[in-house]
Each structure stands twice: as C-alpha cells, then as structure tokens.
Amino acid sequence: MKQKKHYEGLTDTEVLKSREQYGANVLTPREKEPLWKQFLEKFEDPLIIILLIAGFLSIAISCWEYWGLHVEDGAAVFFEPVGIFLAIFLATTIAFFFELKADKEFAILNQVNDEEEVEVIRNGNTTTVAKKDIVVGDIVIINTGAEIPADGRLLEAISLHVDESTLNGESVPAYKSVKEEEFEKDASYATNQVLRGTKVMEGHGIFQVEAVGDRTENGKVFEAAQIDDSVKTPLSEQLDGLSVLITKLSYVFAGLIIVGRLMVFFHWSPIVWTLTVPTIVFFWLVITKFDGWKWYSKTISTVAYFCILMTCVIVFHDCLMPDKSMAGLLAHALNTMMIAVTLIVVAVPEGLPMAVTLSLAYSMRRMMKTNNLVRKMHACETMGATTVICTDKTGTLTQNQMRIYQTQFYALANQTLDDGLASCLLKEGIAVNSTASIDYTDASNPKVLGNPTEGALLLWLKDNQVSYQELRETVQVVDELPFTTERKYMAVLVNSALMEDKQILYVKGAPEIVYGLCKQTDCNVPKEDIEHQLEGYQEQAMRTLGFAYQIVDGKTEVFKDGRVVADNLTFQGIVAISDPVRSDVPDAVRECMKAGIDVKIVTGDTSRTAKEIGRQIGLWTSNDTDKNIISGPDFAALSDDELDKRVKDLKIISRARPLDKKRLVESLQRCNEVVAVTGDGTNDAPALQAAHVGLSMGDGTSVAKEASDITIIDNSFSSIGKAVMWGRSLYQNIQRFLLFQLTVNVAACFLVLAGAFMGTESPLTVTQMLWVNLIMDTFAAMALASLPPSEKVMKDSPRDRNAFIINRSMGWNIIGVGGFFFVLLLVLLYIFEHADITALRDILHLQLGEVNGLSPYELTLIFTIFVMTHFFYLFNARAFETGRSALHFKGCRGLLFIISIIFIGQIAMVELPILQKFFNIVKGGLSFEDWAIILIGSSLVLWVREAWHLIKSSKE
C-alpha cells in the first residue's frame, strides 16, 4: 500500500536482537504423546484385541496338549501361539510406523503456513519475509485479503475492516482506524489493534508488531491447522459400505465353518443337525438386525455364542459320541473357534483405511512437488472426478509478468514524460493511486510487491527515472476508494503540491468504466478513436487501464456510497499491458479436454481479450459463436432456467464479477457436473466454497486460500491438470488394493470352508492365515497405495462420482481369478487327501485311493502354492487398467522392496527350521525341485496376463 509517512523499520541487527529477546513468530504445537504411548494405543484396536483373544485361546490349546495330553511334540506345541503374538507385534509395528509417516506428510500444511510471505519495511526498504521471521518492532503492510501475521498497533488505516471471528465469534468484520474519534468503546479488541490470524476483508493499513508467536492472542488459544479429514466423501461412504458387506459375508463363512467342523467331528450325527438351526438364526440376526453394531462387537458376540453352543455339545457329548474323549472335543472346539475368528480377521478389510491413508499421504506429498498444496483431504479424491474447470485468466493461463506494452496518454508529446503539468499529474496519479510497491533489496532485479498490474506501472515510472516513493511522500491522502471487482476502478483524493489550496482526485481502472465517468478528454480525443485503440489492444490479448483526474476544492463531494460522484473528470489516456500466455498452458488445456474435462474462462477482462487468450490456449476455435461467450451483465440477466440450458455451451465469461463465478458453479452443479474453480481474491471465497474443489492461487489472499481445498503454489493451469491426474491415480490405487484383497478373500474363505466340510485339517492354520492377512492387508496396502500416477488416466473420461468403486471389470476379475485359485487349490486338496504325495512331481503319475488325510508336507504345499499364486497376482493387480505391462517397474522402488520382502519372507518361513515350527511347516521344508515347480506353475497367472496384454497392444 502507499504510505502517508516514510518508515525506516528495523535494521538487520535490530531484527536479530528482537528475535533473541521476544522469540520467533511460531506457535508452539501442543506436546504430543510419547512414541511408546502411541505404540501401545495400537493394541486398543478391536482387531488386535480379537487377535490377542485368538492368541490366548491358542495358548490354552497348547497348554492342554502339553500337560493334559502329553503330545509327542512337547514344547513345539507352543510355537503356534508364539507365532500369533509375533504376527500381532509385526502388524502393530508396521501400522504404527506408517501412521507416523502419514502424520509427517499431513503436517506439511502448518509448515507452509509459516512460510507464507509478509510485506514489511526494513532498513528503509519495502521487502517480504516469511511469516515465521516477523519480529516485535517490525513495520508490516497489510492489504485486502491478507492474514495478519502478528499482534500489533496500527500506524495507518484506510477503509480497514478485519474479520476477527476466529477470536471473538463475531460474523461482522470489525472496523479499524487510527483516529481516536472513531474508536469503538464496546469493541472486543481495540479499534487501532490488529491480531494474528484475523483477516483483512477490505482496505489496507500499516501496523507495528507488538507480540509474536505464543504471546499473541491467537497463540493463547492456538489449535494447529489440520487437514480436514472429517468430510464424508462418496468414496469414503462407499468404502464404509463395502467394509460392512465384506464383514457380513465373513460371518456367513465363520458360521458355516463352525457348523461344518462340528458335523464332521461328530460324523454328521442327527443331533448336531439340530444345533445348526440356532447357529444359522444367530448369524442371521447378527448380520441383518444389528447394523448399528461394530464388526468387533459382532465378533465378540460370536465368541460368546460359540461358548454357549459348545456347552450344549458338551452336555450331549455322551449321546453324540461316547467313544470320543472330552479332551479331544474341547481341543477341537477351541481350534474351530480360533479358525472361525481368524477367518473373520482375515476377511475384514482392516487394511483398507491404511491403504486410503497411505494413498492420500503419498499423493499429497507428490502433489506438493507438482505445486499442489492439499488443504482438505477429500479434494485429492474429488479432483479425479472433476468434469469442469472454471479458471481465471491472469496468472493462471498467463505468466502474470506484467509489462507496459504501450501508452496512449493524449497530453504527452511522443509519450515522453517531462516536467509539464500533464506529465506531473500522470506521474503523481500512478504513484499515489496504487497499493503496490517495489522491493529494491536486489537493485539489479527489483521485485514487485502487491498487484502485478500496478507494479508494472511503478516499474514504468522507474524506467522513466521517476521515484514513486518520493511522489508518495509529497502528498497527503485525504480519502480513497480501494479497487473492487464490482466497481472495476480505484480512486484517491489527495492534497498535492501541484495545486495549492486545491485537491486532486485520481481515478484508475477499466477504460470503458473510467471513460464513462469523465466529462472530457485531454486534447479532445474523439470517443471513436479511443474505442478503436482499445479494440486493437484487446485483440492482442492486452490488459488495458484507463486514467482520469479532476482538480477540486475542499468542499466538492467526490465519493458517495462507495462510488465516484465527481462530475468533471478528465480522461488522460490508456495503457496497454502485456501478460503472455504460459508456454505450458496450451498443452495442459488440450490434455484436460482429451480427458473429458470442460474448461471455462471466467475473467474480468473484455470479451475481445478473453477470446484472444482462449484462441492462444486452444479453447476458442473458429467454430465457436456468440452462444459460447457471454459478458458479466448479460450473464447476470439470465434466469436460473435460462442459465442451466446454456451453461454447458459457455466457454468464456468476460467482465465477470465474483458472484458470477459462484452462480456459474451452482448452475453446473445443478447439471450434475463436478466443478473445480480457481480464485485468488477475497471476493472469490464464496465460489471457492461452493465448488466441489476450490483451487486458490499461491499468490492469492489468505481469505481465498482458507476457503479453498487445494492451493496451486505456482498459479499455473498445468498444475491443475496434474492435480486431476493425481486424483484419478489415487482412486485407481485404492481400486487395485481392493482387487487384490477381495481376490485373496474369495480364495481363502472358500478354501477354509471347503476344508471344514471335507473333514480335513484346516488347509490354512491360524498363523498361516495371519501371514496371508499380513500380505493381503498390510503389505498390499503399502505396495499398491504408493504407485506413481499413469498419464494414461488422462485419456479416460471422468468417472461417475457416485459410481460404485468396484466396477464390472473388477468384479469379473475378483470372481474369475479368485474362483480359479479356489478351484485349483480345492483340486490339490482333494488329490493330496486321496494320495500319498512325497514330491510335487508325483501329481503327474498318481493313483487316487482312500481318504488318508493330509500330511504336514502336503499342507506345506497347499500353503506355499496359495501364497505364491497370490504373490504373482499382486503384479497383475498393480498393472490393472494401466495399459502397461505388469513388469513395468519405473518409479516403483517401494513396490519392488515390498515384493522382495514377501518373497524372501515366504522362502524363509518354509526353509528356516525356527520359522517352520511357528507356521506348521513340514520339517526340512521343500526341495529345490518343489520350489521350481511351484514358482513356474504359480507364475502362469502373470504370464497369461502378459500374453493377453501383448495381444491387445498389437491389435491397438
């Protein structure tokens, strides 16, 4: 802003002393719980509690076998419970580690807030520093839309209104002034005081810092900025519903396993059949009638029911099976309950929240590197479903590097400034009717602070050897009207040395608006000539400004109701300012249009300027007509019904106001579009809040940033396209995790269920199922949640925001592949039960005989084949709908690391003697030949997919 006085501000030495005495301008976050306590909180997870119950049940069985039955294995019976507890420890440790990692990613918002630049005066020069570097004694300049960085006392205030609702709850902005006669006695805070965290809604001012950091009013009630993850998006609601469905199905399988194992144990006794009825009724009630119950509540009730059921079995034991020992019955019952509970644990997708969290954390970090700062978590997902982007022109489509292209000041000969009155009026008007300033810290590269358009004018003065600071110091500001997008001009009334006993009114803004306020023109230039000049500039996509002045006496009313009412203004001329299109924008717009996303320009510029920019970026074509463009006034005149019929055809709204942008968003939403909108000003906040995704600009106001969901740090449209790509990729990563997990679910649940009714030992033991669960949930979440985005997603149409996350292709994959794995393993289970297999190659020339049960070697084969088939299927899931080979690993170091852990872990589990005991693996493990056959056979799932991919690629 322009200063009424010259301020020196603090020197570098004084800054260091102040920081040492009063501290840094950083709010100390609340002390976090120690890491050990956070780790122990993981054991409060209901899933972990249920696993602990299973572990203690396993200990009970082992104790019974060791002391009651005196089994031959001796202490080896305790390896299974130890394995369960090791699995629990591993699961909690991994979850704890990645939760810490995600927290660090989400903390980035606070760090960025502290790095925001603030305009200050130091060493007699206006410059910018990070918010955290503000110190007591600093002179800070604040403008409309700024967030006040520290507590202080106002030195100057022009039409200053501040939103203090974050501190006092008042919805009406507080008026601020340095004039004692305007002080409000009943105000929550002093009229000449400004406070950290409050926002300038109108006007501008200068204040001196009196308190920083924890000593500010805001610091006393500090609550760290958080990424908002409380919003229930369509995706999160779908995932919640999917989890409920999977949980219900897991109870069906658990109930059937209990029934099946009991019937087999009692040789299908008729009395046992009577126990199936209450079991079926119980699970039906739990699944259908108690939707309000959490899944772990249902699991605990299942355990309680099972205890009651087993009590009934024990009571009728002598009638059912007098030749079976009570000890054997109890051991079988406990083992059955453990298998049922573990299956529920395996089936419930507890890894889904981790997959979503990791996907969000990873996406947010990588989006930050592509200049997208995510402020609200749901925006990551919603950007992927965006169908329309409503974008500003200046700074987003253009470089925002304003330079004076040409001047047309009618009183200047050869457009050269001199010492004449006309030149002096122009120089003074440009200098004082401005809120911008220039940072001369680096004299060879002056930096514009504030509005780039106004900065271009100040640089033009500099190029003409005119000091805007000296001009500002020679005048006294009497009154002013700040620029607004509604008025489209700004004005200032000053006491000037150019006119003794007179005042001068300077007006600057949109040429047609300013010219409309004027009574005459310098040198009597005809209106037609001015219009012709403007058309020429606008057709070159130039931004234009008009200038006017009036000399008045102190009694003339010049402002009324926020408008200029002076009636004798003289139009001085126009300035054309160039702002080239960003070089990467045409390709980015083309990419969005190929991705099925409509782009609409909403700008305050004229229709000619907007159309030329649209043409340069490839949006406006020779086929477009007047139905594709509309001016702000015409737009406002449309009824809602008329607008809804026309809105999809619109490509450009010129001379738009902020409320036009909000109304455009609402109309598009009524037409079932998912809308992202850009904004940088305070008045853009309503549109940013109304859109599905609000995109604020990095150099936008704090008000706009707070209203937005994502901040585009470099202001570029190409960064918006990257945000869409990341949003689509995040959604696909979650789909891939679900594809893999549900395929494993289908195979595991049906395999264990088949084993229960076939009367064999459970094909997968408790510890083996927990290892599968670790692969399926934790490791798969880690592997698939952090996959880099594929540019192929930008060739697809936007997804239906409300469509079910499991699409038709996924459904067929889950049923087909999961069913195939189940049938394959069921066939092997049947063969192993009816043949004595000592080497896997025996399958090629075997003869089936009577049922002889499963040997430890055969169970080891089943377990290893199950894991390795799904291991290779993980590659397929990773490549799902990418159009790439499953062996394409560019940028997937994390995936390769996790795949290596799974592969090495499985080999170690089968071959290391100490782990063999924990996971019920046959002593001695498998032979090299067995491993070769298993790896070659199970990898066919990968090679078949690759062959199909090659066939499709060749056809395309």
Predicted regions and their residues:
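Active-site pocket-lining segment
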Residues: V867, F875
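Active/binding-pocket-proximal capping segment
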Residues: N168, I837, R841-I843, R878-T882
